[in-house]
């Protein structure tokens, strides 16, 4: 792609804007809309993905991601598979069938970051990739994606009531089936993308070490969100989940921060160490 330096600069700016908007909402009680903050993350993933896979490749990622995630979310709302029994409230705005329109872009933005981090840890998937890499990258990326939801779902559902787990769950009102469903859903669309790249992807591409570092930093910025939320929390009130179980917001926010530090931030640190250890040529060749 042309103008790589310009795009690299734009990506750093987007990461900074995302961090500033997200953290300011919590620290200073601002009211920057969720959609606006999510748009920044979407643009970051879109540009970052296009630099590696070109516009056609990242477009394929988006289509696969949106179709698979919407089908499985709607299926679960209707049947309980694969996430469990839940429903969305009207807090997130208009819906596509039974799922808010904002959910698809969230899958894309965070799913791409998980994919990008996994390629740092395992290797990139391209036309000449081995079968091992083709399956290992989406498998590991699915864990990286679920790490995000571990530090997000109890806050969004039990406290903010964006969606309701109708039978509650042991993890602050969230059931284990939610995380198994997340893993399954993310693995399906990332595996389909990996197979697409194996057939239609380009040959090896030279990218700077800083390119990979941007995805690691953005993933860490997202991971810091529950930590900042915990530090900004000023109240500790009782809330109930969909089954009537009572939880305390202080316990939820502290637990989310603890979990995220030792999952997402650990994964980001591991990827950063991997980048620093790799010879320059090996990092550039993906």
Report each predicted region and the residues it spans.
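Aromatic-rich, lipid-facing transmembrane alpha helices and their immediate juxtamembrane interface loops
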Residues: 1-286
